[in-house]
UniProtKB/Swiss-Prot annotation:
Residues 206-220 are annotated as: Leucine-zipper. One of its GO terms (molecular function) is sequence-specific DNA binding. This is Transcription factor TGAL4. GO terms for cellular component: nucleus. Its main location: nucleus. InterPro entries: bZIP, bZIP_sf, TGA_domain. Transcriptional regulator involved in defense response. It comes from Oryza sativa subsp. japonica (Rice). It comes from the Eukaryota.
Amino acid sequence: MGEASSSSGHPRQNPHVLGYGFHGAMPNSLPSANLFEQQGGANYFGELEEALMQQVATLRRTQQTATTTSTLHHGDTTPFSTTATAAATARPPPTLDIFPSWPMRSLHTPKEGSNVTADTTDSESSSKNNSNQNASSDQHVLVGDMAGQFDQIPQQEQHKKMATNSPTHSSKTGKALDPKTMRRLAQNREAARKSRLRKKAYIQQLESSKLKLAQMEQDIHRARSQGLLLGAPGGNTSSGAAMFDVDYARWLEEDSQRMAELHGGLHAHLPDSDLRAIVDDTLTHYDHLFNLKGMAAKADVFHLITGMWATPAERCFLWMGGFRPSELLKTLTPQLDPLTEQQVVGICNLQQSSQQAEEALSQGLDQLHQSLAETVAGGSPLDDPNVGSFMGHMAIALGQLSNLEGFVIQADNLRQQTIHQMHRILTVRQAARCFLAIGEYHNRLRALSSLWASRPREILVADEGNCGELSIAAHPSESQYSAF
């Protein structure tokens, strides 16, 4: 009976077992049941267990490799290597496709008379399936975490760059700054930038002033060595006068160069176009001299009118701080031959108009001298001891002295206009010869001054003896009027 019951109960269990093993099989499929009986349930579950263990071992090796890689890179500051990144982000090896895509429990509930072995097999396969699913889910979670770390690294770097470059974040607190603070920071940066620019400009100005001062010292030393600067009595030379002396010494050097160019151009028979360029440059050079004298007249008019900037021989021919235009024309006319009739008439008219202007300026200067002398002589402290009255007369005298500046400037304008008129009347080559004659005339006067200053000592002693004899001869005449 037991055997019969077991044999009779066995066909009832086959549909359930086949239902768990094969999804598409029918419960009453006899060929499938016979095949399962021939192979044996033990062999089937043994192969299933072996495949699951291989899969679990593969998952454990993958997990250990990922853990080792993450530990190494957490201890190092260098970024992950390309191999580790590829291994971490790679997909897990494919699993055996031996499980159904739907839940393992069959929709058909087992009957009450099922075999205990079938239930045990069902529980074992379910537990192994759950462990396989848990291992797969753990592997996916681990790979997802590592991929997230790899994704977070460039995102963190990008956020750092944005925080560094963005003006709305503070480098210390990491909080957004309000517009008022941002505006104040921008103003501070702009003020610092302007301060640096001002400091740089100030340093450059100091350097240029230092170089200019050194150049001025060299020019003054050179001018004094040439006997051009004798200085005012007592050393009361103003800064404007000293500046003009330096500029005039430099102008003389440049004038010598232009005279050499004119001399070379005339002897080389340059074309009129090339020679005209040299003549025009020389005329501009004289205009620059008159501009310098105008600034010096405003700074210290007495320095110009007394001729302290010129040599002693030049002072003998000085008129209101310069040469007389009419006298210069008389000196130049014989050296400009041959002249056309029209040129002679033009030069004569220019000379006549220059003389008239000179006389007018001389009369005005004489009147100024007379009025100035009367102002200074009036209001003597002996007659009027009032200090206020005396200071009033001094104020009037100062106002009259300011007119002296105007006379010197008008005289320079007359000299400048005379040179320009001569440039218009003469041809290019005649104008070149004219400028050469003017330069040579003043060079000879300066040479005469140098010779006078460097004359031998015996001549100086003889001059002193002559002066002594004159003074002795003058004493008897003075003694004749001693009674008076």
